[in-house]
């Protein structure tokens, strides 16, 4: 391997000293936030305006300083059904209620994987994946599992706490506890002893800690509200499951996660099964890998049908948070830092860890150009009303093609050929083989 030499440094210095533009850029960056300078107002302005197709939604939510975007997006789809059923202008489901059970399920899954793989080497790829511990993050299928098992409740029944809005310290504390528990469980299994009496005690500790941080989940509640005509309604002693069945009633298994991840290990037109990615023990995440054009076509169909779309993208790529825009032409960090290029094919970008799905939101609209093709997309974010257009964002078609990786589609919009693909044998990918 070659190290940096004095000759090399001299050449680098001479190259920079001869570049007057680079020195001007340094002067600007020395005193100004890079995000302010990277944004190109003229390019961003072309993304403003109404949308050809737009789905009405009931306002912006705020996940605060937590990583629960995936759950907010899922519940924001469900709340539209409640609002329609009850004739409400505004409504929100409790994110805290399901977040509690998400943490509990992730802790249980962690301990079960430790027990199941107790003979695996501690420094092996599998155990190092397990020992990453829990996070706030998740996917559509994890939200579905939680909703089907635990139901949902209105936000006023289990409101946010400071800890549910600021989860970092709780997650750090739980991971320290779980890693200590992992050490003990591995030692018990390796000594030929039953680990489950100790696991029960460990789960009780996690449950108590989660109750202290987030509040103990309700088992039943009364639902009282006034509809848009000011008529009073009340139903007593509802369980979260009964509330879901009566006021939401969606068959969530009719929705399919469609991904566009054109990597060497994920063939297109093929179901992909991500082993051990789920929050619940023994569950795998499944998705159908389609071309970008097919994914986009399904999104347009669903929006035209009046249905918002849960989707996942790389929120760190070409984003202007304050302006509420994702667009390579509008956010030019490369030009600001000397004019280099980060262009890579979409599949290679994933393979080289240059990009991944980091944020989930809702697609709620699309605008078509003069040829009838999408050129910008409306997004309902969960970052509150102080950013974007009162909390709504927009992304360009260029961004959508390169940095949108997943969309959840009602199977009614699939072609017969696409439905048949769901019956194919899936390609199985272990979570520890990729960055999940």
Regions found by a protein language model. Give the residues of each.
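Conserved catalytic-core surface of thiol
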Residues: 369-436
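Short His-Asn-centered micro-motif
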Residues: 72, 311-314, 364
């Amino acid at each position: 391997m070659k190290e940096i030499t004095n000759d090399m440094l001299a050449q680098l210095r001479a190259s920079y000293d001869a570049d007057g533009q680079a020195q001007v850029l340094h002067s600007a960056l020395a005193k100004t936030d890079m995000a302010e300078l990277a944004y190109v107002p003229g390019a961003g302005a072309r993304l403003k305006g109404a949308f050809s197709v737009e789905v009405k939604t009931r306002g912006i939510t705020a996940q605060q300083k937590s990583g629960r975007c995936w759950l907010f997006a899922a519940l924001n789809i469900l709340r539209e059904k409640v609002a329609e059923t009850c004739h409400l202008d505004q409504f929100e489901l409790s994110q805290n209620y399901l977040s509690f059970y998400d943490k509990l399920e992730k802790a249980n899954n962690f301990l079960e994987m430790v027990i199941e793989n107790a003979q695996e080497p501690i420094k092996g790829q599998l155990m190092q994946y397990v020992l990453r511990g829990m996070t706030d993050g998740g996917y559509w299928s994890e939200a579905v599992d939680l909703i089907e098992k635990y139901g949902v409740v209105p936000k006023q029944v289990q409101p946010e706490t400071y800890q549910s809005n600021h989860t970092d310290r709780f997650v750090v504390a739980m991971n320290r506890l779980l890693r200590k528990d992992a050490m003990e469980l591995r030692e018990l299994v390796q000594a030929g002893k039953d680990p489950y009496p100790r696991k029960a005690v460990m789960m009780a500790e996690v449950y108590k800690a989660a109750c202290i941080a987030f509040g103990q989940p309700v088992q039943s509640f009364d639902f009282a509200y006034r509809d848009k005509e000011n008529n009073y309604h009340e139903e007593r002693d509802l369980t979260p499951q009964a509330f879901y069945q009566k006021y939401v009633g969606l068959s969530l298994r009719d929705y399919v996660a469609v991904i566009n991840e054109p990597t060497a290990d994920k063939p297109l037109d093929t179901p992909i099964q991500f082993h051990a990615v789920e929050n619940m023990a023994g569950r795998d995440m499944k998705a159908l890998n389609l071309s970008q054009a097919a994914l986009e076509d399904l999104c347009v169909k669903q929006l035209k049908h009046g249905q918002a779309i849960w989707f996942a993208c790389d929120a760190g790529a070409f984003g202007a948070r304050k302006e509420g825009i994702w667009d390579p032409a509008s956010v030019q960090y490369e030009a600001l830092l000397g004019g280099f290029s980060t262009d890579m094919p979409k599949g290679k970008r994933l393979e080289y860890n240059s990009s991944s799905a980091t944020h989930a939101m809702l697609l709620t609209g699309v605008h078509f150009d003069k040829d009838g093709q999408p050129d910008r997309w409306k997004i309902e974010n969960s970052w509150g009303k102080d950013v974007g257009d009162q909390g709504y964002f927009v992304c360009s078609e260029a961004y959508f093609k390169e940095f949108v990786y997943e969309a959840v589609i009602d199977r009614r919009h699939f072609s017969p050929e696409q439905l048949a693909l769901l019956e194919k044998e899936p390609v199985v990918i272990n979570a520890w083989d990729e960055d999940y």
